[in-house]
């Protein structure tokens, strides 16, 4: 297996999502790392956002979608089962959900951390203002905050250079 060879070569971080292959990606990864769970870091994402399709008009999501508490609690159980583990190292909101208050999402994620089902939380595909709003909300409500923010970045998609990358650089007297 490619995953076994990657681990032999020192790879220990694996990222997937409940939406990749409708959970099959998580199942394959779970089988591949079985017996080596303590040696790997598993990151997975939640939020089935079919209602936010680029092709059709967004509609009001059901409780089975998005970043609602109900959906998060259901999806984490599915991911744990698919992955064959009792905890997820990094659990990430796959997209910003405009229909669910960020407070609801963050409270649900905070509960998962306190339950031991998730070690850290993060986000993926959020704009800079959305990351800031989530971080501010976490601080104001004394909740676990995002430990990571995944963004699309490659030769064709360099949008993050304008809003997400600049704050990453630490101010230094040498930069002046």
Task: Pin down the residues of each PLM region.
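Acidic (Asp/Glu)-rich catalytic clusters
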Residues: 8, 30-41, 80-84, 113, ...
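Active-site groove signature of glycoside hydrolases
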Residues: 80-101
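Short, acidic/polar
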Residues: 1-6, 65-84, 131-136, 161
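N-terminal binding-site loop/beta-alpha segment at the start of enzyme catalytic domains
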Residues: 1-44, 86, 174
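Beta/alpha (TIM)-barrel catalytic core signal, keyed to glycine-rich beta->alpha loops juxtaposed to Asp/Glu
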Residues: 22, 97-176
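Conserved beta-strand positions
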Residues: 16, 90-93, 123, 151
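N-terminal small/glycine-rich loop or linker at the start of catalytic domains
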Residues: 43-63, 87, 92
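Active-site mouth loops of central-metabolism enzymes
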Residues: 57-73, 94-100
């Amino acid at each position: 297996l490619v995953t076994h060879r990657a681990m032999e070569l020192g790879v220990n971080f694996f990222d997937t999502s409940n939406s990749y292959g409708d959970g099959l990606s998580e199942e394959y990864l779970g089988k591949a790392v079985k017996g080596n769970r303590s040696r790997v870091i598993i990151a997975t994402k939640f939020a089935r956002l079919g209602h936010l399709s680029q092709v059709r008009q967004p509609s009001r999501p059901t409780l089975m979608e998005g970043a609602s508490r109900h959906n998060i609690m259901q999806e984490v159980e599915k991911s744990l089962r698919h992955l064959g583990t009792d905890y997820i190292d990094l659990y990430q909101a796959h997209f910003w959900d405009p229909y669910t208050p960020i407070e609801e999402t963050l409270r649900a994620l905070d509960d998962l951390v306190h339950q031991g089902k998730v070690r850290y939380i993060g986000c993926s595909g959020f704009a800079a203002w959305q990351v800031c709003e989530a971080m501010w909300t976490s601080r104001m409500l004394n909740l676990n905050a995002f430990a990571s923010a995944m963004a699309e970045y490659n030769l064709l998609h360099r949008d993050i250079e304008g809003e997400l990358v600049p704050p990453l650089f630490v101010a230094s007297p040498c930069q002046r």
